[in-house]
UniProtKB/Swiss-Prot annotation:
Molecular-function GO term, any one: ATP binding
Active-site residues, as the UniProt record annotates them: H38
Any one Gene Ontology cellular component term annotated for this protein: cytosol
Function comment: Catalyzes the condensation of pantoate with beta-alanine in an ATP-dependent reaction via a pantoyl-adenylate intermediate.
Entries under Gene3D superfamilies matching the protein: HUPs, Pantoate-beta-alanine ligase, C-terminal domain
Further remarks about this protein from its record: The reaction proceeds by a bi uni uni bi ping pong mechanism.
Source taxonomy: Bacteria, Pseudomonadati, Pseudomonadota, Gammaproteobacteria, Lysobacterales
The protein's name: Pantothenate synthetase
Residues at which beta-alanine binds: Q62
Length: 280
């Protein structure tokens, strides 16, 4: 039976009790409105820990002024059932006052230079500062041995890895594979914003990522690969924020096409902003 906690002292008592028994504890942070991708992270965490805590907190500091904080989908009953079925042991439900006791305006910010300043960092200024700030607080509250994040948010995972290394958090960071719909669309809590007409078109993002990989692999110049990807998305009806090929650390690759790379796309379809990536 999953335990639901809203009090920080109760959470710490539970986790400390587990640790006194010599058990490893994992954290799966979420913003709720959960889907199969989130539950796969719980199952991944379970492979590396004896107990799994998932948090649901819609974090106001990672939303920009014109973004969807107020209307972000909240589905608490379904989330609880899904987490229990996935094998989660405890659900941590902090409120804003617990997460930001001095208020969000006085919250001590955390910025991960470099990796958080490009791509999503350019499109959504301050977003990753909010992510780092809330994740660091969750780490301090739960004090896990392991934490799992999805690779769909590739840059977010890179930012968190940098923060953990730089601030010496004694936490192993796991990256969970992207879970996709049958047509290739990466599962996302924001997919429900898509209209019935937009939903089939949205799968073009994954198709374009595959084209980017294949084109780059045969030696097509990176700029040409990126331009072709943007054009294909625009022709399908997207407004493109970026379609790029990067090295795993998100720096720009040189002239060589060997080694590991990642293609990343962010684009809007109607009012819905979608992100996806493909490692190769």
């Amino acid at each position: 039976m999953i335990q639901t906690l809203t009090d920080l002292s109760a959470l710490r008592a539970l986790v400390n009790g587990w640790k006194r028994e010599g058990l490893r504890v994992a954290l799966v942070p979420t913003m709720g409105n959960l889907h199969v991708g989130h539950y796969s992270l719980v199952m991944l965490a379970r492979q590396y820990a004896d107990r799994v805590v998932s948090s649901v907190f819609v974090n106001p500091t990672q939303f920009g002024p014109n973004e969807d904080f107020a209307c972000y989908p909240r589905t608490p009953e379904a989330d609880l059932r899904g987490l229990e079925d996935a094998g989660c042991d405890a659900l941590w439900l902090p409120d804003v006052d617990t997460m930001y006791p001095l208020g969000t305006a006085l919250a001590t910010p955390i910025h991960a230079p470099g990796v958080s300043d490009v791509l999503e960092g350019e499109c959504r200024p301050g977003h990753f500062d909010g992510v780092c700030t809330v994740v660091a607080r969750l780490f301090n509250q739960v004090q896990p041995d392991v934490a799992a994040f999805g690779k769909k948010d590739y840059q977010q995972l890179a930012v968190i890895r940098q923060m953990v290394a730089d601030l010496a958090f004694p936490i192993e960071i796991l990256g969970g594979s992207i879970v996709r719909e049958a047509d290739g669309l990466a599962m996302s809590s924001r997919n429900q914003y898509l209209s019935a007409e937009e939903r089939p078109t949205s799968a073009n993002i994954h198709k374009v990522l595959l084209q980017m990989r294949d084109s780059y692999a045969v030696g097509t110049p990176r700029a040409q690969v990126e331009d072709a990807a943007s054009h294909a998305l625009e022709q399908a009806g997207f407004r493109v924020d970026y379609a790029v090929v990067r090295l795993p650390d998100l720096s720009e690759p040189g002239d060589g096409h060997t080694g590991a790379h990642v293609a990343l796309i962010a684009a809007r379809l109607g009012s819905t902003r979608l992100i996806d990536n493909l490692e190769f």
